[in-house]
Amino acid sequence: MIIAITEIMDLIPHRYPFLLVDRVLKIDPNKSIIGIKNVTVNEPQFTGHFPARPVMPGVLMVESMAQLAAILVAKSLDSTKNKEVFLMSIENTKFRRIVQPGDTMHIHSVIDQQRANVWKFSSKVMVECEIAAESKFTAMIKDKM
């Protein structure tokens, strides 16, 4: 099932310039998800990171993995309209390849464990069949206040 940007914006609260998932290519609710982020030189982070050689900041690769995991949560639950996803921990993060404008980040997220409102994920960013970044996340799902 492909999920376009308009539905992604219905599922998570992030907006430009902090919306870091452009499309979902495949989703298996309660199991896994694959999405993409097209990296372009017009994005604001590249004005300072780094002007002579733009490089996607690692923290934004981590954020893209977390956003994709939140989309997986939203599609796995019956409804998330009254729920929020809060990141609790980030572990074992590794950066293995530079990502730059012109690259397409293929983001993968797998649910490792779900107990009540606590979910654990393994995620990675791939560029041209190489791992660019990988991380493990724990998130909590709470009712909106």
From Swiss-Prot:
<dbReference type="InterPro" id="IPR010084">
    <property type="entry name" value="FabZ"/>
</dbReference>
<protein>
    <recommendedName>
        <fullName>3-hydroxyacyl-[acyl-carrier-protein] dehydratase FabZ</fullName>
        <ecNumber>4.2.1.59</ecNumber>
    </recommendedName>
</protein>
<comment type="function">
    <text>Involved in unsaturated fatty acids biosynthesis. Catalyzes the dehydration of short chain beta-hydroxyacyl-ACPs and long chain saturated and unsaturated beta-hydroxyacyl-ACPs.</text>
</comment>
<keyword id="KW-0441">Lipid A biosynthesis</keyword>
<dbReference type="GO" id="GO:0006633">
    <property type="term" value="P:fatty acid biosynthetic process"/>
</dbReference>
<keyword id="KW-0456">Lyase</keyword>
<comment type="similarity">
    <text>Belongs to the thioester dehydratase family. FabZ subfamily.</text>
</comment>
<keyword id="KW-0963">Cytoplasm</keyword>
<keyword id="KW-0444">Lipid biosynthesis</keyword>
<feature type="active site">
    <location>
        <position position="49"/>
    </location>
</feature>
<dbReference type="InterPro" id="IPR029069">
    <property type="entry name" value="HotDog_dom_sf"/>
</dbReference>
<dbReference type="Pfam" id="PF07977">
    <property type="entry name" value="FabA"/>
</dbReference>
<dbReference type="InterPro" id="IPR013114">
    <property type="entry name" value="FabA_FabZ"/>
</dbReference>
<dbReference type="GO" id="GO:0016020">
    <property type="term" value="C:membrane"/>
</dbReference>
<dbReference type="GO" id="GO:0009245">
    <property type="term" value="P:lipid A biosynthetic process"/>
</dbReference>
<dbReference type="GO" id="GO:0019171">
    <property type="term" value="F:(3R)-hydroxyacyl-[acyl-carrier-protein] dehydratase activity"/>
</dbReference>
<keyword id="KW-0443">Lipid metabolism</keyword>
<dbReference type="GO" id="GO:0005737">
    <property type="term" value="C:cytoplasm"/>
</dbReference>
